[in-house]
Amino acid sequence: MAPTRKRAGCLLIGEIALNLNEINFSFGGLHCLRDFGCIYVENKGHAITPKIRRNEYDISGTPGTILMPGDLPETLEFDGTLFFIRDPPSQAAAQQQLRRIAAWLTNGRQRLIFDYEPLRYYMASVDDELNWGFSDWIDGGLDVTFTAQPYAYALDETTASATTSGTSAQINFVLTTGAPAPIRAEVLNTGTAPITGATLTAGGNAVQLSGMNIASGDALLIDMEPPIGAAFSDGENALPYAARFDYLTARHGPQSISATLAYGSGTKGAKITIKARGRF
């Protein structure tokens, strides 16, 4: 429903008053109200969960479909309209402001954070054309459709670490979000002996690398966020050293992630840090 009138601090939609700080958003670090003087009104509400694309097949002579593993969430759409909170002094000024807004919104995929959910963000982009219309508001409004990747991500990563002066360590990790989250791991050499091998295990899956030569102060970085990979702290690709490279995720709740290390000669020592960005 289109806005009908404004009062201090609130936008009135029918008989419902919404606080302005509850319906706006930031995109790519800029805020629609604070940086562009616009309020955002959702056109049809907003999606809570994405549509699921089932991995299913039709088989001749069999009723219905056969469901296979591998369901995938699809993208989300957030559809709304931006309205100027103060009328531009002229049509030329309005056009200049609209071009600033268009440049902001069409700058590729960025973090989209709604004010009513400040600790979560979507990775979103505006791919459709932007249209200015006069049907909903006497001074006009800019129709905007965000296409978002299927998860809302926690603004802050969950982090846990453990140190060892031997060949093994257990990292106690607690993820407070529902969906499994890809793990990022750092194995930092804090001793004098080079680290020649490392195995990380989480939930039955494992990453195993051998034949390395990680010197004191250097690190191995493993990242399960796409594009999945492993590298040393100097940027060298570590995947050629991998004997096993399963997909590691943290699940909801407390869990233990184990690390097993192999060394050359010298004093053993390492710090293992595990990170995961929760998703909803």
Feature names for model-found ranges:
Residues 2-58:
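Polar/acidic, low-complexity leader/linker segments enriched in S/T/G and N/D
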Residues 33-38, 121-128, 207-213, 241-243:
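Short amphipathic beta-strand/extended segments with alternating polar/hydrophobic composition
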